[in-house]
A protein has these predicted regions:
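C-terminal cap of thioredoxin/glutaredoxin-like
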Residues: 3, 8-13, 19-35, 39, ...
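Structural alpha/beta surface segment adjacent to cysteine/selenocysteine redox centers
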Residues: 19-130
């Protein structure tokens, strides 16, 4: 039986996607090779200054957003969160790290490094921001992530300079829009029939996967 594909959309600056890594890890431990995550990106923090100035204008701006995130993190004791998140460092855009990560994904597809390197870099990128409060929109931070994962930045630069990483990222953003992705994180299963958005509990994701394992045919709609 082929592994069940889970198309996973996220924005690397989204704290709920950072929390959702716990669910992704649990799914991988439980199902192993029976599931396959397909990592894609959506744009939630494409222009962070505008987003915060509009969505949080009457709620304390960056200070209010910081308090909101720290309160949300209190429900996830396993998670490490820097107390000055979004205060000491304010990344301008998630597009920059997304572009870097798409270049890594292209490199994995073409055999430049292992297919698991994207996951390693993605985890490191999120940890660098949410745990260390470093600016992940800065290319110097990208170089450090690449170095820790033994990624050749010359290869990454080749995919970016050729425009291929831009094209791949544009495809992600467009497909997110076409698929009705409302935000980050979003899990899509069963060729789009099952869409799980936001702070979704592990048991809900598990129930959707179990249903597909019982009835894997794409011709038969799931009850979930």
């Amino acid at each position: 039986m082929k592994p069940i594909p889970i198309v996973y959309y996220s924005d690397v600056l989204c704290v709920w996607a950072y929390f959702a890594q716990l669910r992704v890890d649990a799914i991988q431990r439980t199902y192993g090779e029976r599931v396959k995550f397909e990592y894609r990106f959506c744009s939630v923090f494409g222009e962070t200054a505008r987003k915060i100035s509009t969505a949080w204008a009457t709620k304390g701006g960056y200070e209010g957003f910081n308090a909101h995130i720290r309160h949300a993190a209190s429900g996830f004791p396993e998670i490490r969160l820097h107390p000055d998140i979004w205060l000491s460092v304010r990344p301008a855009s998630s597009m920059s790290p997304h572009l870097f990560l798409k270049a890594i994904q292209l490199g994995a597809i073409e055999g430049e490094w292992g297919i698991d390197i994207l996951e390693i870099a993605l985890r490191d990128m999120r940890a660098t921001f949410f745990e260390e409060a470093q600016d992940i929109s800065d290319q110097e931070t990208h170089r450090k992530v690449a170095e820790r994962a033994s990624i050749d930045m010359n290869v990454v630069a080749r995919f970016i300079n050729s425009g291929r990483a831009h094209a791949a990222l544009a495809t992600d953003y467009k497909e997110a829009e076409n698929s009705g992705v409302q935000g980050s994180p979003t899990f899509i299963l069963n060729e789009g029939r099952q869409k799980l958005f936001g702070n979704v509990g592990y048991r809900i994701i598990e129930a959707n996967i179990e249903e597909l394992l019982r009835q894997p045919s794409a011709d038969q709609a799931s009850w979930c």
